[in-house]
Amino acid sequence: MSGLEQLTDQEKKILERVNRKMRVAPITFREASAYIDHLHRHHRATIGCKFCISVLGDDGDIHGVAVCGRPVSRRLDDGFTLEVNRVCSDGTRNVCSMLYGACCRIAKEMGYRKVITYTLVSEDGASLKASNFICEGEAGGTHWTGKRNRGQEIPAEMKKRWVKNL
């Protein structure tokens, strides 16, 4: 009896997810928004974007998406800074790191000098660290203040700003 035959069904499913070959591919804003609305833990899709990308498995299934756009903070919107507004995955290993890395490569090709993104203070930022982002510390507030953003169900928690100079 081989070692694989002794694995439980759950362990086999985990192994299948780890061993998949994945690739980055473009995705429409509409498709990315639908994915985010379905799977994101605490945010809805964004209003607009500069570009969207996805990570596809060798079976063609979407395992994660990223939406990039202008910085939400007017103070940081200098024309050379791109913000990764949303990253969402189905939990497949390394997908978020792949998305952040691809976003940075694309941003550099487009002429951006810096990429920023935010996480909740309660999130550890492991995929950002793996993609060589640096935590600048706490930023923003616990809720949106603009009229346009009222009523969004966003956790009342401080954010951490992460930056990567290109």
Residues covered by each model-derived region:
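Acyl-donor binding region in acyl/amide transferases
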Residues: 23-26, 50, 56-57, 62-65, ...
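Short beta-strand-to-coil "C-cap" segments at the C-terminal boundary of structured domains/repeats
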Residues: 163-166
